[in-house]
């Protein structure tokens, strides 16, 4: 699957943006299948968006199957028409680097087509959760049986985005399109919502608990960070010192201080957990745009430099920063990232197909694998309690479990 253009097409699918995508009319070429494209695709997408997404005939059909059910004859006719008139465009290819570690990747198609799983969550009971951003649901998968269940969000079109779990097993999520944070009790399905106290905090993004049970979160477009006390629902917000810095990924260090990356600029920032004062650190390259961040046990931060195609390292103790070119090059668009047992894992979302990348800081060696479905942009990933990984494959409408089988002698 052709990951970047495909996911940009899939991003616009159904619930949240359906009405907004109907504008920007274009003139489609005459031919067999034109009327079906106008009837089926234009319900939720602008035809300009459709026309700008170039795929092969097979890839169009793969896309349909993850978004909507179409009769096979209609799917074939639409795919043939689009592939003829809007052919596949050149895109960066994945670079596969062999190595001593073996992994197996198993993917599951989630129940609601077109839901666009955004973030995955590996819970303490061994289940895998995901946010169905466009379907307005939270989903749960038991990877041992394949059983899945979806829980509808309380507020319509709230855009469930980030996910985390508290010590009681409740699932917390950010309602990215509704300015709220939600708590789901998976035993009852009951949801408690916490609205942002400031309307400018319109899009809560990444949530993470600290060691004291306080929920910290970023607010990307609102240019803020926040904290929520689950005991009383109190929310405090702080504005990023840099305008339009786009606070994005967030982690907590061993001392309980939240760190976040600023996707709109080349900065990493720390929040004082007591005063909520924000201190920013500027990364050396002005073109760097850190999107997600991971942290190792020594409190060193690792970030995906989405714009430059690099893996970055920042040591808060010394202020030193260093980076490495991602295997698939400057257009690889590193995205979801996690640290597991001292090893850095991340996704390359800009290549065809998306890749899973392993980086060993001790040897500075990379190893990569392709994601079977193509990935469709892996926006986030998380480590499981037993040392594996879970992924959300947004544009492919799937979640995945990566089982890591370490070879003898490998680190």
Locate the predicted segments by residue.
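Electrostatic cytochrome c docking/interface patches
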Residues: 18-36
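The canonical Cys-X-X-Cys-His
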Residues: 38-48, 78, 82
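C-terminal capping alpha-helices of c-type cytochrome domains
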Residues: 68-94, 126, 169, 389
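Beta-strand-rich domains and repeat architectures in extracellular enzymes and scaffolds
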Residues: 106-136
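Beta-rich, blade/repeat-based domains predominating
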Residues: 113-124, 156-168, 199-212, 242-257, ...
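Conserved beta-strand positions in repeat-built beta-propeller and related beta-rich domains
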Residues: 129-134, 171-177, 215-221, 258-264, ...
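Short loop/turn segments that connect beta-strands within beta-propeller blades
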Residues: 142-146, 185-189, 229-233, 272-276, ...
């Amino acid at each position: 699957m052709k990951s970047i253009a495909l996911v940009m097409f899939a991003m616009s699918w159904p619930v949240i943006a359906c009405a907004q995508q109907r504008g920007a009319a274009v003139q489609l070429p005459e031919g067999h299948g034109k009327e079906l494209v106008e009837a089926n695709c234009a319900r939720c997408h602008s035809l300009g968006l459709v026309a700008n997404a170039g795929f092969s005939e097979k890839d169009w059909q793969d896309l349909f199957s993850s978004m909507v059910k179409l009769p096979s004859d209609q799917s074939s006719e639409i795919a043939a028409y689009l592939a003829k008139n809007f052919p596949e465009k050149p895109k960066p290819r994945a670079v596969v680097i062999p190595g001593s570690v073996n992994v197996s990747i198993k993917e599951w198609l989630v129940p609601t087509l077109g839901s666009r799983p955004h973030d995955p969550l590996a819970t303490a009971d061994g289940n895998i959760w995901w946010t169905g951003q466009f379907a307005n649901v939270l989903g749960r998968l038991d990877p041992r049986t394949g059983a899945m269940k979806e829980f509808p969000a309380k507020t319509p079109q709230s855009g469930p985005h980030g996910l985390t779990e508290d010590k009681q097993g409740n699932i917390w999520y950010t309602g990215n399109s509704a300015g709220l944070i939600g708590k789901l009790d998976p035993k009852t399905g009951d949801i408690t919502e916490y609205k942002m106290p400031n309307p400018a905090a319109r899009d809560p993004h990444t949530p993470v608990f600290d060691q004291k049970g306080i929920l910290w979160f970023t607010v990307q477009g609102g240019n803020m960070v926040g904290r929520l006390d689950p005991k009383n629902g109190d929310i405090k917000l702080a504005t990023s010192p840099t305008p339009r810095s786009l606070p994005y990924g967030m982690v907590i260090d061993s001392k309980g201080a939240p760190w976040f990356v600023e996707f709109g600029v080349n900065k990493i920032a720390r929040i004082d957990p007591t005063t909520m004062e924000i201190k920013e650190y500027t990364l050396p390259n002005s073109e760097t745009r850190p999107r997600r961040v991971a942290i190792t046990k020594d409190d060193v931060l690792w970030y995906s430099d989405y714009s430059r195609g690099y893996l970055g390292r920042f040591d808060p103790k010394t202020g030193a920063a260093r980076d490495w070119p991602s295997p698939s090059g400057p257009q690889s668009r590193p995205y979801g990232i996690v640290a597991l047992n001292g090893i850095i894992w991340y996704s390359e979302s800009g290549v065809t197909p998306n890749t899973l990348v392993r980086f060993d800081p001790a040897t500075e060696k990379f190893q990569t694998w392709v994601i079977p479905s193509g990935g469709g942009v892996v926006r986030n990933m998380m480590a499981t309690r037993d040392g594996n990984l879970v992924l959300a494959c947004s544009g492919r409408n799937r979640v995945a479990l990566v089982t890591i089988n370490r070879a003898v002698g490998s680190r």
